[in-house]
């Protein structure tokens, strides 16, 4: 088995952890800047509390991102053996420029999986070759409460943070 990509759980979740830290830094920093210095009472209510309200909203986004990331992490990782059906280099408009994403569509014979990869990992993937992916499936924030059992299961499996890719025989 050739290891194509490997990352620890911390490495797999690093992008989410950076966003969480950024949200909490902005939210708590805004609250401290707004309410620690003495404000003159002559300022209008809206002007006095607008930064505080914005900071609370940013903190709310930080908390929801934390909960969603925690749910995904505690759900555990999943390992599937799949065959690559298609490699795609997708270019989308991002604000004023264009962003390129590298994706592989795979199947295990029952379900389809779409994995987003870095360019160097994507370059190592071969169409019609078999790989073993270990990943953390995405788990939405309120999935346990809002989602009912469906009699028609989805053909696509939501994929999330990849921790390991190995090339295996078909």
Identify the meaning behind each predicted range.
Residues 118-134:
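Short nucleic-acid-contacting surface segments enriched for D/E, G, S/T with interspersed K/R
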Residues 45-73:
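Internal/C-terminal transmembrane anchor helices
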Residues 136-170:
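OB-fold/S1-family single-stranded nucleic acid-binding modules
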Residues 25-56:
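Cytosolic-side transmembrane helix boundary signature
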Residues 42, 69-71, 76, 80, ...:
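Cysteine-centric segments in proteins
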Residues 74-98:
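Structural detector for short beta-strands of small beta-barrel domains
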Residues 93-114:
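OB-fold (S1/OB) nucleic-acid-binding surfaces
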Residues 1-37:
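Membrane-embedded alpha-helical segments of integral membrane proteins
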């Amino acid at each position: 088995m050739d290891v194509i990509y490997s990352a620890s759980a911390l490495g797999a979740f690093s992008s989410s952890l950076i966003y969480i830290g950024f949200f909490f830094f902005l939210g708590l920093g805004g609250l401290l800047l707004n309410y620690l210095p003495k404000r003159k009472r002559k300022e209008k209510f809206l002007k006095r509390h607008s930064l505080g309200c914005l900071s609370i909203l940013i903190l709310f986004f930080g908390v929801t991102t934390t909960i969603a990331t925690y749910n995904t992490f505690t759900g555990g990782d999943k390992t599937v053996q799949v065959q690559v059906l298609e490699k795609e280099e997708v270019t989308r408009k991002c604000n004023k420029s264009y962003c390129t994403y590298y994706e592989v569509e795979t199947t295990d014979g029952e379900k389809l999986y779409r994995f987003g990869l870095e360019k160097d990992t994507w370059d190592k993937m071969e169409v019609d070759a078999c790989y073993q992916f270990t990943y953390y499936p995405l788990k939405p924030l309120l999935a346990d409460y809002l989602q009912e059992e469906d009699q028609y299961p989805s053909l696509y499996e939501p994929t999330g943070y990849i921790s390991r890719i190995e090339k295996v025989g078909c």
